[in-house]
A protein has these predicted regions:
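P-loop NTPase motor module signature
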Residues: 1-242
Length: 242
C-alpha cells in the first residue's frame, strides 16, 4: 500500500469524524461484536435483513476503528442511485457536507475529496479501478454491500478480492449479504466469521374491503377504504408533530 507521510496521517487522524450511533438500529446493538470481528479477521460477513442499518452504520463502525486513515473506506452499491443516497445519508449522520468526509463516484459524477474517508461507488466503478490500480492501494477497507444480488460485477469483485487479500494483509473486507447466501460467502473466504443482524420490525394494520361489494361497485369500495386510511395517516402525522 502507498505509504502516507507521518504529517498526512497525523492530520487525517486529527480530522477523523466522530460517529454517533443510534440504538434504534439493530446493527448497532451488535456494534462491539462487529468491531472485534473486524479487528481480529481480514474478512467479515455481515448477514443483515432490510432495515437493520448495516448499509449506513458499518462504514461508521469502520471509522470508529480508525479505518479510512491510511486509505479510503470503499463502499460499493449495486446501483448509482443507491450509492448517491447512501453517501448523502452517511454524510448527514456525520454532520459533513457531501463530498468532504463522505463522497461518491458513479458514472458521470465524481464527488470525492482528497481529504475524504468514505467513498461510495457502484461495484462497476471499483471493478474498473482494478485495471489501473491492481492492488487497490487507495483503500484500507472495502465494504461490498448487497453481495447476495450476485451481479456479474459483484461476482468478479468477490473472486478478484479473494486473490488480492494475501497481497494486501492490511486490507479489510466486509461483505454484507441476505441470510440465504451468508454461509456461502463465508466458505468462499475460508470460513470467515458471520455476524447475523435482525431487521427492524414495524407494526402493520390490516384494512379489509367492505364485504359484499360487486365488481361494478369496486371504485366506490376503493374510496370507502381509502378515505379512512388518509384520515388515519394524517392524524398519525399530526400527533407526531410532523
Amino acid at each position: 500500500m502507498k505509504k502516507l507521510s507521518p504529517e498526512i496521517i497525523t492530520r487525517r487522524l486529527a480530522n477523523l469524524p466522530t460517529p454517533v450511533f443510534s440504538d434504534d438500529l439493530p446493527v448497532n446493538v451488535r456494534r462491539e461484536e462487529i468491531k472485534r470481528a473486524i479487528e481480529q479477521h481480514q474478512v467479515v460477513i455481515i448477514c443483515g435483513e432490510t432495515g437493520s442499518g448495516k448499509t449506513t452504520q458499518i462504514p461508521k463502525i469502520c471509522l470508529e476503528l480508525k479505518r479510512g486513515v491510511q486509505g479510503l473506506i470503499g463502499h460499493t452499491q449495486p446501483r448509482r442511485i443507491a450509492a448517491r443516497t447512501v453517501a448523502a445519508r452517511i454524510a448527514a449522520e456525520l454532520n459533513s457536507p457531501i463530498g468532504q468526509a463522505v463522497g461518491y463516484k458513479v458514472r458521470f459524477a465524481d464527488k470525492i475529496s482528497p481529504d475524504g474517508y468514505i467513498k461510495l461507488m457502484t461495484d462497476g466503478i471499483l471493478l474498473a479501478e482494478t485495471q489501473g490500480d491492481p492492488l487497490l492501494h487507495s483503500y484500507d477497507t472495502l465494504i461490498i454491500d448487497e453481495a447476495h444480488e450476485r451481479s456479474l460485477n459483484i461476482d468478479f469483485l468477490i473472486g478478484y478480492i479473494k486473490q488480492l487479500l494475501p497481497k494486501r494483509p492490511d486490507l479489510k473486507l466486509i461483505v454484507t449479504s441476505a441470510t440465504i447466501d451468508a454461509q456461502r460467502f463465508s466458505r468462499h473466504f475460508n470460513d470467515a466469521p458471520v455476524i447475523e443482524v435482525t431487521g427492524r420490525m414495524y407494526p402493520v394494520d390490516v384494512w379489509y374491503r367492505p364485504i359484499g361489494v360487486d365488481d361494478d361497485e369496486e371504485e366506490d369500495a376503493v374510496i370507502q377504504i381509502t378515505l379512512p386510511l388518509v384520515t388515519f395517516i394524517r392524524n398519525g402525522r399530526n400527533s407526531n408533530g410532523r
